[in-house]
From Swiss-Prot:
Organism lineage string: Bacteria, Pseudomonadati, Bacteroidota, Bacteroidia, Bacteroidales
NCBIfam families named in the record: L29
Name of this protein: Large ribosomal subunit protein uL29
Family statement drawn from the similarity comment of this UniProt entry: Belongs to the universal ribosomal protein uL29 family.
GO process annotations (BP): translation
Listed GO CC annotations: ribonucleoprotein complex; ribosome
Pfam family, one: Ribosomal_L29
Alphabetical list of SUPFAM superfamilies matching this protein: Ribosomal protein L29 (L29p)
Molecular-function GO terms, alphabetical: structural constituent of ribosome
Keywords of the record: Ribonucleoprotein, Ribosomal protein
Length: 65
């Protein structure tokens, strides 16, 4: 997910998306430990996407104060 797409999302949508992506990330890590994924770089990409979303949420929080 690109930064521009993240910035266009509403705060509520962003919170829901972060929660869903964290669940997806945890499931992916568990699946990878059981049997290797075809593309283990997906784990890294998903982790970074979650970080981008959390960063945007934090920036919005600081701008509202």
């Amino acid at each position: 997910m690109k930064i521009a797409e993240i910035k266009e999302m509403s705060t509520n949508d962003l919170v829901e998306r972060v929660e869903a992506e964290v669940v997806n990330y945890n499931q992916m890590v568990i699946n990878h430990s059981i049997s290797p994924l075809e593309n283990p770089a997906q784990i890294k990409q998903l982790r970074r996407t979650i970080a981008r979303m959390r960063t945007e949420l934090r920036q919005r929080e600081l701008n509202n104060k």
